[in-house]
């Protein structure tokens, strides 16, 4: 342990990382640099600075960075261009924040000359994988300290006891009723784990939810919302141009007011176990619905289907911590290329937990052609007779398979009606132009042909005999 002289700690000021800070000082006897990221979690971050100072951290070794714009612009928006959802439900609010934190940890290591990084992820979770894969991808030789894989403080109760023993200030409001929820928040979502949520059959308490009202208590009047997209990203809300992080903050506010974005799920962790978590993702829920709506009129069918095929793989890469991997980067290039035409406006209606698409339009890139799609007279824009051949060609393999199945089952196979012989049309002679000479000739009476005289047979003469 003595070879580590300085470590950069991902520090939130909460229970886990406050205990880790003291533990690093006691066990590793090293200099600690703290990094606290402002990801839009909605908490005052200055208390984290005060806690770090109280723990003996030098002011120059305390980093508190506002990374909200970078987070949404370079991580959340690229992920939503892919319509990313993990296992059909989870919008990856925690997962997508980890690669940015790992990136900033390595940058601070390079700035301060630190030997290692340290994180507060448990040995059971996904975050340990995400932090460390990111760190190794960006700085292959970096050392990593993961206290949960080293110490004997294996429960939140033991953490609180350690904190009390060493005079570490923590929120103790749940002390009598049990451990507090394990929560993680950023501009995209807030998550809840632990306590009675460890029973997947138990309903979450209403008092747990922080960002959204219950749909039952949401306003009785719907609210309309216009989102403008440019190359797959929202750039304006109700006609007002906004920065990326401002867009998501506003959508969180509007969605929370209407009870949008609550989620209770059991997910499959990368380490192999199932885990129950509750999430509030109001802005992300609105963003996903709107993005799919604008793509519905601006993306070619096969391109859209290809994106849908690739999305689960992309989601797994993000969830499992492979944001900085070559395969995720390659997929991103493809996805971003598809977004060049994803421009336009989507109109939504927010009502009691629902995001309802009521309109979508692109003045420059819409592939929706009403002259072809109409149920009225299309003036020949689409020849419906063409559909017959299209259907027969696409049915060919189905008919062949059905015939084969019939033969195997011993059923008579319907014979195809014999085709009628095709007669070749005799080409009509092309009429020659009538000349004056021909016309005059036509006016003269036609002379009757002379009757052919009968041909007389030749008379044979007798052959004279020779004298003896």
Curated annotation (Swiss-Prot):
One of its GO terms (cellular component) is cytoplasm. It is found in: Cytoplasm. L-aspartate binds at residues 122, 126-127. L-citrulline binds at residues 90, 95, 126, 130, 182, 191, 267, 279. SUPFAM superfamilies: Adenine nucleotide alpha hydrolases-like (SSF52402), Argininosuccinate synthetase, C-terminal domain (SSF69864). Its EC number is 6.3.4.5. Gene3D superfamilies: Argininosuccinate synthetase, chain A, domain 2, HUPs, Single helix bin. One of its GO terms (biological process) is urea cycle. Residues 445-457 have a biased composition (Low complexity). InterPro entries: Arginosuc_syn_C, Arginosuc_syn_N, Arginosuc_synth, Arginosuc_synth_CS, Arginosuc_synth_type_1_subfam, AS_cat/multimer_dom_body, Rossmann-like_a/b/a_fold. Keywords: Amino-acid biosynthesis, Arginine biosynthesis, ATP-binding, Cytoplasm, Ligase, Nucleotide-binding. Residues 445-468 are annotated as: Disordered. The keyword Iron-sulfur does not apply. It comes from the Bacteria. ATP binds at residues 10-18, 37, 120. Pathway: Amino-acid biosynthesis; L-arginine biosynthesis; L-arginine from L-ornithine and carbamoyl phosphate: step 2/3. It catalyses: L-citrulline + L-aspartate + ATP = 2-(N(omega)-L-arginino)succinate + AMP + diphosphate + H(+). GO terms for molecular function: argininosuccinate synthase activity; ATP binding. Residues 458-468 have a biased composition (Basic residues). HAMAP family: Arg_succ_synth_type1. Homotetramer. Belongs to the argininosuccinate synthase family. Type 1 subfamily. This is Argininosuccinate synthase. It comes from Dechloromonas aromatica (strain RCB). The gene is argG.
């Amino acid at each position: 342990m003595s070879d580590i002289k300085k470590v950069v700690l991902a520090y939130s000021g909460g229970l886990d990382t406050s205990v880790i800070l003291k533990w690093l000082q006691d066990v590793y006897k090293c200099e600690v640099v703290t990094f606290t990221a402002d990801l839009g979690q909605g908490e005052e971050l200055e208390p984290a600075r005060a806690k770090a100072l109280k723990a003996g951290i030098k002011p120059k070794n305390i980093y508190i960075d506002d990374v909200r714009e970078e987070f949404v612009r370079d991580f959340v928006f690229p992920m939503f261009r892919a319509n990313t959802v993990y296992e059909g439900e989870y919008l990856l609010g925690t997962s997508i924040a980890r690669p940015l934190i790992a990136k900033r940890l390595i940058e601070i290591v390079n700035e301060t000359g630190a030997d290692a990084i340290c994180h507060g992820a448990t040995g059971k979770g996904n975050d340990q994988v995400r932090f460390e894969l990111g760190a190794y991808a960006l700085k292959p030789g970096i050392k990593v300290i993961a206290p949960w894989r080293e110490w004997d403080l294996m429960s939140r109760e033991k953490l609180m006891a350690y904190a009390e023993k060493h005079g570490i200030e923590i929120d103790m409001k749940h002390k009598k009723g049990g451990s507090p929820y394990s929560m993680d928040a950023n501009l995209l979502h807030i998550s809840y784990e632990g306590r009675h949520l460890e029973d997947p059959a138990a309903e979450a308490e209403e008092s747990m939810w922080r960002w959204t009202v219950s749909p039952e208590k949401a306003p009785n009047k719907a609210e309309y919302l216009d989102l403008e997209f440019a190359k797959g990203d929202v750039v304006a809300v109700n006609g007002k141009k906004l920065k990326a992080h401002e867009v998501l903050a506003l959508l969180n506010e509007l969605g929370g007011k209407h009870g949008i974005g609550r989620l209770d799920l059991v997910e499959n962790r990368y380490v192999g176990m199932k885990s129950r978590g509750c999430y509030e993702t109001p802005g992300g829920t609105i963003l996903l619905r709107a993005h799919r709506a604008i793509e519905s009129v601006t993306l070619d069918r096969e391109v859209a289907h290809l994106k849908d095929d690739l999305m689960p793989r992309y989601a797994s890469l993000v969830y499992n911590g492979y944001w900085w991997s070559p395969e995720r980067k390659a997929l991103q290039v493809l996805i971003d290329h598809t977004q060049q035409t994803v421009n336009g406006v989507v109109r939504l209606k927010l009502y009691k937990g629902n995001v309802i698409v009521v309109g979508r339009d692109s003045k420059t890139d819409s592939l929706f052609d009403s002259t072809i799609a109409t149920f009225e007279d299309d003036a020949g824009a689409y020849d419906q007779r063409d559909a017959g051949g299209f259907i027969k060609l696409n049915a060919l393999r189905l008919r062949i398979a059905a015939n084969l199945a019939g033969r195997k089952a011993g059923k008579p196979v319907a014979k195809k009606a014999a085709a009628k012989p095709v007669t070749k049309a005799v080409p009509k002679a092309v009429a020659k132009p009538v000349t004056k000479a021909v016309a005059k000739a036509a006016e003269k009476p036609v002379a009757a042909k002379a009757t052919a005289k009968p041909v007389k047979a030749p008379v044979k003469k007798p052959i004279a005999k020779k004298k003896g």
